[in-house]
């Protein structure tokens, strides 16, 4: 039965590789619970999908669009933070400069500030 169905579909989708992609996608839709547009006649989902394409109850163009939509992914691009953006653009950041001061130097500076030095 499937061989005859493939021969019937070649008129609607001339490229057999594309036909396989479309029929497989439609079979997955049927497995996911989509309504069948032809009588099942105890056939499995791939054969039903080929029969739908052959009978033109499923348009090849519509199937193609749904296949493309199903395979498209949206990639979110994270924007860098403002500080990182400034550094990437070559500007200096607004952060205070951190001074690596030893504990001894810090105590001396505090004592000098208080006038005990």
Swiss-Prot record:
Question: EC number(s) on record?
Answer: 2.7.7.6
Keywords (alphabetical) are: DNA-directed RNA polymerase, Nucleotidyltransferase, Transcription, Transferase
Gene3D superfamilies reported for this sequence: 3.90.940.10
Matching InterPro entries: DNA-dir_RNA_pol_omega, Pol_omega/Rpo6/RPB6, RPB6/omega-like_sf
Q: Which SUPFAM superfamilies match?
A: RPB6/omega subunit-like
Catalysed reactions listed for this entry:
RNA(n) + a ribonucleoside 5'-triphosphate = RNA(n+1) + diphosphate
Example of a GO cellular component annotation carried by this entry: DNA-directed RNA polymerase complex
| Quaternary structure, from the entry | The RNAP catalytic core consists of 2 alpha, 1 beta, 1 beta' and 1 omega subunit. When a sigma factor is associated with the core the holoenzyme is formed, which can initiate transcription.
Enzyme class label: transferase
Q: Does the keyword Aminoacyl-tRNA synthetase apply?
A: no
One Gene Ontology molecular-function label: DNA-directed RNA polymerase activity
GO BP terms: DNA-templated transcription
Leader peptide range in chain numbering: none
State the organism named in the record: Ruegeria pomeroyi (strain ATCC 700808 / DSM 15171 / DSS-3) (Silicibacter pomeroyi)
Identification of the protein by name = DNA-directed RNA polymerase subunit omega
Q: Does the keyword Transferase apply?
A: yes
Q: Family membership, please give it.
A: Belongs to the RNA polymerase subunit omega family.
Q: What does this protein do?
A: Promotes RNA polymerase assembly. Latches the N- and C-terminal regions of the beta' subunit thereby facilitating its interaction with the beta and alpha subunits.
């Amino acid at each position: 039965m499937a061989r005859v169905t493939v021969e019937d579909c070649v008129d609607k989708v001339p490229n057999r590789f594309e036909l396989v992609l479309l029929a497989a996608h439609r079979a997955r839709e049927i497995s996911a619970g989509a309504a069948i547009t032809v009588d099942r006649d105890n056939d499995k989902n791939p054969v039903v999908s080929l029969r739908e394409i052959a009978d033109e109850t499923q348009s090849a163009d519509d199937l193609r669009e749904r296949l493309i939509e199903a395979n498209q992914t949206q990639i979110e691009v994270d924007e860098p933070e403002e500080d990182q953006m400034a550094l990437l653009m070559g500007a200096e950041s607004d952060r205070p400069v951190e001074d690596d001061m030893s504990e001894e130097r810090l105590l001396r500076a505090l004592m000098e500030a208080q006038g005990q030095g």
